[in-house]
Regions:
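Pyridoxal 5′-phosphate
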Residues: 1-379
Length: 379
């Protein structure tokens, strides 16, 4: 199989990841729940992984990195823990439902004000709209770093400057960029960075988290066992315990730690360069095929390793099925949990076929994918 669905999850991971998970299952106890060897090993692994993530994202404090099951949970924690009745938030048409649905629910249930920066037919935003939508009660701007549909990358540093100039926080969904595009929380002005472990970070599914700037207060979304202060009625308020009620996925975190070793040794810039080259090769190979429409801004200097397209008026699911059944190529059709972006692109009925690349793909695989698109378009 030629796997080109890396924006959904990376299938091909460093072999160290699986080995680390198996070893953890054989040796680890429960982190912060005891002083025996197994519990201490789990605690060391968890904290060591926090330190690696802090280094990767330039997060000021490792103890302000909170583990979750995925970026959806991380975003729910951040959005629900920061926005309250009377607050206002700004988001964009570029968002995944993991941002949209928590915001919609707060709009309905807490009366949180909500405005969106619209995207054009190429999925681009006007940064002046962020400034125009700011209100006196704007508490946060919540936005993705990279659209999971178009691959367009937002200028997070520019958005962060606008947010902070008006006293608002910046919450960033880094699901599509963590591990594949350099992220510096300090330089970009990110207050809360939400990430998942199973995509560009090449870790196991069931891992993710938040990186929180010191001074940012997030109310606990869930409370319960913490391993410390057990006689207190309330959840401990220090990070990361404040937001980590219950047993952590230490086995998955061990796998994530192994993946981070590979990324930190290789360098995110090197991974980005390779993935960009594969993406660009595919784009150049399909953009002029008769009947093919490609979505997104390919003139931008920085973008995710994503190419989304349609072939004539063919249903996107039918095209994706043909790619899988006739060519052994895995892609993602449909709506991609990005309804506002599909409306901006005019693809709500047809959907679109997304090709997404990783550093484990090859140029030969890209050439096979180009050939497949050309042949389907000729039918």
């Amino acid at each position: 199989m030629i796997y080109l669905d890396n924006a959904a999850t990376t299938l091909h991971k460093p072999p160290q990841v699986a080995r680390a998970v198996v070893q953890a299952m054989d040796t680890m106890g429960n982190a912060a729940r005891g002083a025996h060897g197994g519990a201490l090993e789990a605690s060391r692994t968890v904290y060591g992984t926090r330190e690696k993530l802090a280094r990767l994202f330039a997060c000021q404090r490792a103890d302000h990195i909170v583990f979750t099951a995925n970026s959806t949970e991380a975003l729910n924690i951040a959005i629900n823990g920061i926005l309250h009745e009377g607050d206002h938030a700004i988001s964009t048409d570029c968002e995944h439902n993991s941002v949209l649905r928590p915001l919609y629910r707060l709009e309905e249930e807490r009366g949180v004000g909500l405005d969106f920066v619209v995207a054009d037919r190429q999925g681009r935003v006007d940064y002046g709209d962020f400034e125009r939508l700011i209100r006196s009660n704007t508490k946060a701007i919540v936005c993705t770093h990279c659209s999971n549909l178009t691959g367009n990358v937002l200028d997070i540093a520019r958005i962060g400057e606008i947010a902070h100039r008006h006293g608002a926080l910046l919450i960033v969904d880094a699901s599509q960029t963590a591990g594949t595009i350099p992220i510096d929380m300090e330089k970009m002005g990110v207050d809360v960075l939400c990430f998942t472990g199973h995509k560009g970070l090449m870790g196991p599914q069931g891992t993710g988290g938040l990186c929180i700037r010191p001074g940012v207060e997030i109310a606990p979304w869930k409370v319960g066992g913490s391993g410390v202060h057990s006689y207190d009625r309330h959840q401990p308020m220090e990070y990361p315990t404040r937001l980590e009620a219950g047993t952590l996925n230490s086995h998955g975190i061990a796998g994530l730690s192994a993946a981070l070793d590979v990324i930190l040794e290789r360098g995110v810039e090197d991974i980005q360069q390779m993935e960009h080259g594969l993406m660009r090769k595919f784009y150049e190979g399909v953009k002029d095929i008769d009947g093919v429409t490609v979505y997104g801004d390919f003139a931008a200097p920085v973008r995710g390793a994503i190419v989304t397209l349609n072939i004539r008026d063919y249903d996107s699911s039918a095209v994706s099925d043909a790619l899988s059944e006739n060519y052994g190529i895995a892609t993602r059709p449909g709506a991609h949990c990005a309804p506002r972006m599909h409306r901006a692109l005019g693809t709500t009925e047809q959907g679109a076929v997304r090709f997404s690349f990783s550093c484990y793909n090859t140029e030969q695989e890209v050439e096979e994918a180009i050939r497949a698109v050309r042949e389907i378009a000729a039918e």
